[in-house]
Design a protein with these regions (language model features):
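Mobile, glycine-enriched helix-loop/loop "lid" segments at the mouths of ligand-binding/catalytic clefts
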Residues: 163, 167-179
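Short beta-strand segments
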Residues: 18, 71-75, 119, 143-149, ...
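A charged helix-plus-loop insertion that forms the helical arch/lid used to bind
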Residues: 84-99
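Active-site nucleophile and cofactor-binding loops and adjacent substrate-binding regions
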Residues: 93-97, 117-123, 143-146, 279-286
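Adenylate-forming
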Residues: 125-131, 152-154, 173
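Short beta-strand scaffold segments in enzyme catalytic cores
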Residues: 24-28, 150-155
């Protein structure tokens, strides 16, 4: 099958990639955003991982069709400003082997003329939840993912916030509990929220993954304290209409009520916010890939 992108006498499709630190999700969608097929596979080294994504699109595009646009939501930090020379590159990431990786070239080499739009994975997830998820009909909200790392996307007045780079919410410093002697998982900052409350931090601190820790484990008291502190900071600085907490760690159903209660205690109900102010995603694990499709549209 030819990989050259042409539109004459061909049906056109959109491509989407959610590139996380541990797994990659790829999808092919109609121009209206309906997903036709998708797959997931582990994040390995850049060359083999990106080539596997290229092969997915080459193998699964319908016959006599073309891929005209690709949206990529990637772990970061990443170059997301098209005006800068580092657009589409992974920057100072702790993910071994990925610093300097170019996310654009493997796809433009395989599909000449392909339009590619790149943003962070959390910004893509924020877009997805805004379309038909937990932030539908809202114009200002924050999406936080708590997985291997921690990141956040901020939407204010229906616009994703970007500046010099993109928000690095995972590297906000928080107060470390006196009882917590853990030195932190982040190689850059000892007491940032990613260093103290990410999935990697849970594993390093307790020797088990989050999904293997029972609800009564002391990890959750500490985890909810740190995440409630983060929500308090975001509320004070951004005043969003809602905070959405996603990612693998938040799939533990007992965690959200703990965070909500600790947030109320810490804030002393100062903001008088609705009960659904802090919630989990409505799109579940599909938030990011749906947002990546939106990037391609």
């Amino acid at each position: 099958m030819s990989s050259k992108v042409t539109t004459q006498n061909k049906n056109t499709y959109l491509g989407a990639i959610e590139a996380g630190g541990t797994k990659i999700i790829c999808a092919i969608a109609t121009p209206q955003g309906e997903i036709l097929t998708q797959t997931r596979f582990p994040t390995c080294d850049p060359e083999s991982t990106l080539q596997e994504a290229v092969h997915f699109f080459q193998k699964n595009l319908p016959l006599d069709s073309s891929l005209t646009s690709l949206g990529i939501g990637t772990f970061g930090p990443a170059g997301v400003n098209p005006a800068l020379p580092n657009y589409g590159e992974i920057l100072a990431t702790p993910k071994q082997g990925w610093q300097g990786a170019n996310l654009i070239k493997p796809f433009t080499n395989a599909f000449p003329g392909l339009k590619i739009t790149i943003d962070t994975d959390v910004n893509a997830a924020a877009l997805g939840e805004g379309i038909n998820g937990a932030a539908k009909d809202l114009d200002s909200y924050v999406y936080i993912t708590i997985g291997t790392g921690i990141g956040g996307g901020v939407v204010i007045n229906n616009q994703i916030i970007k500046g010099h780079l993109h928000p690095e919410i995972g590297h906000i410093s928080i107060h470390q509990e006196k009882s917590d002697t853990y030195t932190g998982a982040c190689p850059f900052h000892a007491n940032c929220i990613e260093g103290l409350a990410s999935g990697e931090a849970i594993f390093q601190r307790w020797g088990q993954k989050a999904e293997n820790l029972p609800p009564e484990h002391p990890a959750w008291e500490l985890q909810s304290t740190y995440l409630a502190s983060l929500c308090q900071t975001l509320t004070a600085v951004l005043s969003p209409q809602r905070i959405i907490l996603g990612g693998g760690v938040m799939q533990q159903s007992h965690l959200l009520p703990l965070i909500q209660q600790k947030f109320l205690t810490k804030s002393a109900n100062y903001w008088q916010l609705p009960p659904d102010y802090i919630i989990t995603p409505k799109l579940g694990t599909q938030s990011g890939i749906i947002g990546a499709i939106q990037l391609a549209m």
